[in-house]
Swiss-Prot record:
It is an enzyme of class 7 (translocase). It catalyses: a quinone + NADH + 5 H(+)(in) = a quinol + NAD(+) + 4 H(+)(out). GO terms for molecular function: NADH dehydrogenase (ubiquinone) activity; NADH:ubiquinone reductase (non-electrogenic) activity; quinone binding. Its EC number is 7.1.1.-. It is a peripheral membrane protein. It comes from Halorhodospira halophila (strain DSM 244 / SL1). It is found in: Cell inner membrane. PANTHER family: NADH DEHYDROGENASE [UBIQUINONE] IRON-SULFUR PROTEIN 3, MITOCHONDRIAL (PTHR10884:SF14), NADH DEHYDROGENASE UBIQUINONE IRON-SULFUR PROTEIN 3 (PTHR10884). NDH-1 is composed of 14 different subunits. Subunits NuoB, C, D, E, F, and G constitute the peripheral sector of the complex. One of its GO terms (cellular component) is plasma membrane. SUPFAM superfamilies: Nqo5-like. The keyword Transport applies. This is NADH-quinone oxidoreductase subunit C.
Length: 246
């Protein structure tokens, strides 16, 4: 089993400029690859004797719009009490039309949608995460890896359905989770949490019909990024290291 630090250096040395970034965080190695280099790099990672990533565990879409922005102010939070200000509820998301929502989305270029691939080497017992950003935010397109790992078929369909990422070369790219005739991609940050339409059963027509949404938009769990004193690593008391319990 290769240590993550060793795997990181091997990847940097072998692939060089084909990796736009490669780093180690929390014991896991992640590599960023351009769409033009994705298939060649992935094929090498699967077939290369030093890599042998035979298994693709997962493919997931990500929408990085408003990434790193929260809805509750936590910079001045302490262990007791609250000092957080929020904007008025918007379209199912706090501040959707402000800095956390559509404005931020429209200002971003080329770094909104990505596919993240989780690879496992059964031969060498190591793992790797590969990320690839689509170059066009309006129509995100990435190469399909189904020709390398056929198991990517349904995972890519899911990313297409939920995020609208188009995988070129996919043998059957159609929706997999949403209903027939569904409009939009529900995991995108600018998709309203209450949805666009509301299904109900019409007893007169004997089928499900769609109508306007009647529920009120509200946020039950705000997006919060906590980096205050409550989440600092606990410090050991002096003189306790090495002592037996009791």
């Amino acid at each position: 089993m290769a240590e993550p630090e060793s795997l990181l250096e091997q990847l940097r040395g072998h692939f060089g400029g084909r990796l736009t970034d490669c780093w180690l965080e929390r014991g896991e190695v992640t590599a960023d690859v351009r769409p033009a280099d994705l298939l060649a790099v992935m094929t090498e990672l699967r077939d290369g004797a030093e890599w042998r990533f035979e298994q693709l565990s997962d493919v997931a879409g990500v929408d990085y719009a408003a990434y790193g922005q929260d809805e509750w102010i936590t910079e001045s939070a302490t262990g007791t009490g609250f000092s957080r200000g929020v904007t008025e509820p918007g379209f199912g998301r706090l501040g959707l039309t402000g800095i956390y929502g559509v404005q931020s989305i429209e200002e971003q270029t080329g770094r909104r949608f990505a596919a993240v691939y989780q690879l496992l080497s059964l031969t060498h017992n190591h793992r790797l995460r590969v990320r690839c950003f689509a170059e066009d935010d309006d129509l995100p397109v990435l190469p399909s890896v189904t020709g390398i790992w056929p198991c990517a078929n349904w995972a890519e369909r899911e990313a297409f359905d939920l995020y609208g990422i188009v995988f070129e070369g996919h043998p059957d790219l159609r929706r997999i989770l949403t209903d027939y005739g569904f409009v939009g991609h529900p995991f995108r940050k600018d998709f309203p949490l209450i949805g666009n339409v509301e299904p109900r059963y019409d007893p007169e027509k004997g089928r499900v019909v769609y109508g306007p949404v009647e529920i009120e938009p509200r946020v039950l769990v705000p997006r919060v990024i906590r980096e205050d004193n409550r989440y600092a690593a606990p410090q050991k008391a002096e003189g306790t290291e090495g002592q037996a319990d009791g």
